[in-house]
Amino acid sequence: MAALPGAVPRMMRPGPGQNYPRTGFPLEVSTPLGQGRVNQLGGVFINGRPLPNHIRHKIVEMAHHGIRPCVISRQLRVSHGCVSKILCRYQETGSIRPGAIGGSKPRQVATPDVEKKIEEYKRENPGMFSWEIRDRLLKDGHCDRSTVPSVSSISRVLRIKFGKKEDDEEGDKKEEDGEKKAKHSIDGILGDKGNRLDEGSDVESEPDLPLKRKQRRSRTTFTAEQLEELEKAFERTHYPDIYTREELAQRTKLTEARVQVWFSNRRARWRKQAGANQLAAFNHLLPGGFPPTGMPTLPPYQLPDSTYPTTTISQDGGSTVHRPQPLPPSTMHQGGLAAAAAAADTSSAYGARHSFSSYSDSFMNPGAPSNHMNPVSNGLSPQVMSILSNPSAVPPQPQADFSISPLHGGLDSASSISASCSQRADSIKPGDSLPTSQSYCPPTYSTTGYSVDPVAGYQYSQYGQTAVDYLAKNVSLSTQRRMKLGEHSAVLGLLPVETGQAY
């Protein structure tokens, strides 16, 4: 193998202190420069290319001398998966040849001589399965492993010659899976040495080395009664002591080791379910409503060109929770706001059912100063504009659930407008009585301070003469508006219940 620049190629070279017999196999692989890759053990390999045959021989030879696959992997610097696959294939088939990469295996068709033997075996023993006929062909030397027909081919021959399929094919496959390992034992494979010459292989013959194979235990199948007993014990404790495990083993007729393994697997499944439940509970805390009381939310979002202060929620316990400032809707949301104006009757009915005040459908005075770039005056519903245009028609309330403080700097806090959940539904004067020089910033986008009290009421502070100028300069679009749009819309009664969300 062309070594990596500046390094001596040492791929798969066993260490000097090993006690297994050594052979003359060269353990250095030559590859074209630039194609070699180094695995986690320091060995060089080419991705997608089979391991060389002399290294495959060495793996089988070391396994024959009792060296564990993990040690073989470290000594030869071959990945553990590669070693295990080569040994498993050798134990099952007696061959160290690599399998086909991609595509399907060529279909093995029985020759006329082999078909005659199949018919002869079937007449001698009518209850013989297809896989047994296949093994008999190998044992008697009529075929080798490269020319022996497949089980499906033998079944096809039997179906054609005898007019019916030899038993159920699915039963044949299950029997084949269950008995193939026993029939294809290492002794049986190695007993057929003469038929193991591989013409297409780089080596003259397959290695003649029997390997010790530890049989794998079959999976334990629990009955409903056993599972019921185990689940009851798991409800009492997740870590039973030795006495509890032995008692369970006697009641369920299982071994104590099986009970211990069941509890280990059950604890792993319980931890997985607990993690999924915690994730589902966390998803409910995402934006879309008020968070639980006393739970801090995201830190204040710093806007580059905005002078809005941070909104705070003051609670009775004295703890202050900082919330990001709500912002105007985006262009997509403005279309939804216009649609909300068309659903004014539904919104008014919603407010009446929930004891909100019903507002008139009048907009602000058309002579009032407006800005075509201002999304507030262009996209708000009539209810919001009617509240802002005629504050005197709404009587004040001394105790409010959410009190919205006025903007800082030049705003009149003496006069205030308030909307109470308990006040009657009465019409508000049209907006033409408002002087043209006076306008108010909607409380939806104002700097708000919420005080949570048990009384259900909403009090809105009136803004002064400079609110329009302040609004024209400072209202901007931001993604934070989407986070708080739901709760502010619910306060203003913009969300019809029957027709779904207006945004």
From Swiss-Prot:
Residues 113-161 are annotated as: RED subdomain. InterPro entries: HD, Homeobox_CS, Homeodomain-like_sf, OAR_dom, PAIRED_DNA-bd_dom, Paired_dom, Pax7_C, PAX_fam. PROSITE patterns: HOMEOBOX_1 (PS00027), HOMEOBOX_2 (PS50071), OAR (PS50803), PAIRED_1 (PS00034), PAIRED_2 (PS51057). Changing residue 105 to R: Abolished acetylation by KAT8, leading to reduced transcription factor activity. Disulfide bonds: none annotated. Keywords: Acetylation, Developmental protein, DNA-binding, Homeobox, Myogenesis, Nucleus, Paired box, Transcription, Transcription regulation. Residues 165-221 are annotated as: Disordered. GO terms for cellular component: nucleus; transcription regulator complex. Acetylation at Lys-105 and Lys-139 by KAT8 is required for high-level transcription factor activity. Deacetylated by SIRT2. Belongs to the paired homeobox family. This is Paired box protein Pax-7. It comes from Mus musculus (Mouse). The gene is Pax7.
